[in-house]
Amino acid sequence: MHVKDFSPKIIPPSPGVYLMKDSSGEVLYIGKAKNLRNRITTYFQKQGDSRERIPFLMKKTTDIETILVSNETEALLLENNLIKKYHPKYNVLLKDDKTFFCLAISLSHPWPRIDAIRTKAVTSSKKQIVFGPYVSAEACQTLLEVIGQWFPLRTCSNREFSTRKRPCILYEMKRCLAPCVNFCSQEEYAETLEKAVLFLKGQVSEIIQKLEKSIEKASQEQKFEQAGMYYRTLKLIQQAMVKQHVEKFHFQNIDAIGLYRKHQETVITVLTIRSGKLLGARHFPFSENAQEDSDLLSSFILQYYANQPHIPKEILTPFSLNIPDLPHLLNKEAPPRIRSPKTGYGKELLNLAKNNAEMHAQTSVQSSVLPYEEMKKILKTQDYPYRIECYDNAHLQGSHAVGVYIVYENNALSPKNYRTFAISSSAHNDLAAFHEVLSRRFSSTSSPLPDMIVIDGGRLQYSQAKKTLKKLNLTGIQIVSIAKEASNHSGSLRHEKLFCDIFPQGIQLPPTSKLLQFFQKLRDEAHRFAISKHRKKRSRDLLLPQEKIAGIGEVKRKRLLKKFKSWKQVMQASQGELETIPGLTKKDIKQLLAKQAEVINLEK
């Protein structure tokens, strides 16, 4: 049905699903309703739907397709399947490949080590023991740091372990038993590993007591720096374990879901309680979501718990969903109890979840949310830029040059869509390199076109981008260039300018501008990504045998490779080992050691 042909009479008053499409046939939004006629009619009434996202949606919608079903449960399932199929912009869609932060001990090695991993299934096996999931990667790293301080287990890779001939510096720091060179017995190592396992299982009271006594003793002896170190370690343990007792709730396994919406932004928070202990919170920000709260939450619950290894016995929601079959859709054998308590401890837990969602929205989410209203007002942006690409390049005096772009999509950075280009030596300056990157990017049809591109540069880069896109016959892509501060890039940013179509000479925004801060964050992320890729390329190039080193010709190179088998091992050889190579002078060895230092610095 074309929107121009809409009439309530042609829509049946039956349960079903509706798909709203644009002029190209792309599905923008998928909704469900008990009564399709009543629901769809509200979109065409001036006061029918108060959601702020609806004007954006209706402006783009040209066609509405309806699918009839027997009941609301069928509508919910069909809506969920269609959302996964079409990925509409205005619906909530969780990633199906969500993994969890865990720690794992591999049992296949005689001297096991503890690793941070990401996995879809948080289960142990004969080959490895898995602990978690933990709230974040930071929590995993914190635990590893604490384990390293208290349990001197190895941290090196299996390859490094097998080739090491003398203990590393961690042994000297008493943070490793040096099993690589048999400085400890397997029984001693196994005993230390068992203590670490007990720690990861939550038996931390002994360590905490020792730390508290150490803090008290160091303070009495006025060793305040040492006391501070013990105190920080104590806090690390408490923060990493994140097991705060909430005994008053009397729940074994429960999730509490909080929902916070403001303007175009939405945050859903899931508080996880297991065995009566609060393990942490997970936050899910969404932008431009057009679903009603009940539809949003039911869709979220279906997608979220489809990716969970274990479903809790009880799920608390901020309001009743009135979908009787929903628990059985999540787990047929052991359907969870889904309820919305209005009083008591359950209500307190829901309030806590909502407060967490609101706090997340006002801090980390808001700091990265696209300030569309300010963008529309200052840059005269016509349509919401769903996909933004930010470009930068990096090189060292023209060598090892790389160009990159990062992607901001669906109100978040999308690292999986970041791209890198090795810039040819013919691109003799920044503008030529930038032209090459843009030309190669937009000659490819594998990635969707952006609505806006942001450039790390000033007026010249902005002009170059316009010329390149014009040459490629690309229109409708807004170009914004953000100029670095001329005097000191790391200092105040108040002198930075934005260049765009309506401000070809640049506009200077106040440092408090959300729009300026948004572009700065994109620029900084692109710069970080470009530098990291440049360093990897330099490091990789330095490890190639053809890398030119003054004084090292073909004969000496062959002698080195005969001894060390690969150029990478040459870059890891000690001075004493290099001195055994026939024909190498002291100057040659000095050059090789300098090149080694360069590689090490790049890998840091």
Swiss-Prot record:
* SUBUNIT field: Interacts with UvrB in an incision complex.
Keyword tRNA-binding found: no
Extract the SMART domains matched here: GIYc (SM00465)
Coiled-coil segments: none
Q: What does this protein do?
A: The UvrABC repair system catalyzes the recognition and processing of DNA lesions. UvrC both incises the 5' and 3' sides of the lesion. The N-terminal half is responsible for the 3' incision and the C-terminal half is responsible for the 5' incision.
Where, subcellularly, is it found?
Cytoplasm
Which CDD domains would you find in this protein's record?
A: GIY-YIG_UvrC_Cho
Which UniProt keywords are given for this protein, alphabetically ordered? Cytoplasm, DNA damage, DNA excision, DNA repair, Excision nuclease, SOS response
Gene Ontology, cellular component aspect: cytoplasm; excinuclease repair complex
* Name of the molecule in the record: UvrABC system protein C
The root-end lineage is: Bacteria, Pseudomonadati, Chlamydiota, Chlamydiia, Chlamydiales
